[in-house]
From Swiss-Prot:
The lineage of its organism: Viruses, Duplodnaviria, Heunggongvirae, Uroviricota, Caudoviricetes. It comes from Escherichia phage T7. One of its GO terms (biological process) is DNA integration. Homodimer. It comes from the Viruses. SUPFAM superfamilies: Restriction endonuclease-like. It catalyses: Endonucleolytic cleavage to 5'-phosphooligonucleotide end-products. GO terms for molecular function: crossover junction DNA endonuclease activity; deoxyribonuclease IV (phage-T4-induced) activity; DNA binding; double-stranded DNA endonuclease activity. This is Endonuclease I. Keywords: Bacterial host gene expression shutoff by virus, Degradation of host chromosome by virus, DNA-binding, Endonuclease, Host gene expression shutoff by virus, Host-virus interaction, Hydrolase, Nuclease. InterPro entries: Phage_T7_Gp3_endoDNaseI (IPR008029), Restrct_endonuc-II-like (IPR011335). The keyword Chaperone does not apply.
Length: 149
């Protein structure tokens, strides 16, 4: 598991969290090739430009983000990206979609996703996602990590 402390996030091997590591092992065990944090999706927070790096890009064009904690700024970012890049299929795998948005919140991560039309799962990527037909990814609108567009 990633550790959080004053100096930031500690990596777990090649991955930044235990859940990312677990999902990568799932894909590897099924012989599925994937790219890990290789693509940056540009998005705009009003008056400033940013990029978002999804965790996994599956061969069928589905981006998968893994989340243990899903804080407010991250939820806002995902809504902005969905608004600015409706052509991208970005889905989330949570450690637990039943986790509440904040202490005392009546809303869980899963309920938030349902409200906003975000596909999600718990623990691992569902087999149905992996078996879905290929979707075109507009790579010309994305930037490869460590490089230009």
């Amino acid at each position: 598991m990633a550790g959080y402390g004053a100096k930031g996030i500690r990596k777990v091997g090649a991955f930044r969290s235990g859940l990312e590591d677990k999902v990568s092992k799932q894909l590897e065990s099924k012989g599925i090739k994937f790219e890990y944090e290789e693509w940056k999706v540009p998005y705009v927070i009003p008056a400033s430009n940013h990029t978002y790096t999804p965790d996994f890009l599956l061969p069928n064009g589905i981006f998968v983000e893994t989340k243990g904690l899903w804080e407010s700024d991250d939820r806002k970012k995902h809504l902005l990206i969905r608004e600015q890049h409706p052509e991208l299929d970005i889905r989330i795998v949570f450690s637990s979609s039943r986790t509440k948005l904040y202490k005392g919140s009546p809303t869980s991560y899963g309920e938030f996703c349902e409200k906003h039309g975000i596909k999600f799962a718990d623990k691992l990527i569902p087999a149905e996602w992996i078996k879905e037909p290929k979707k075109e990814v507009p790579f010309d609108r994305l930037k490869r990590k460590g490089g230009k567009k």
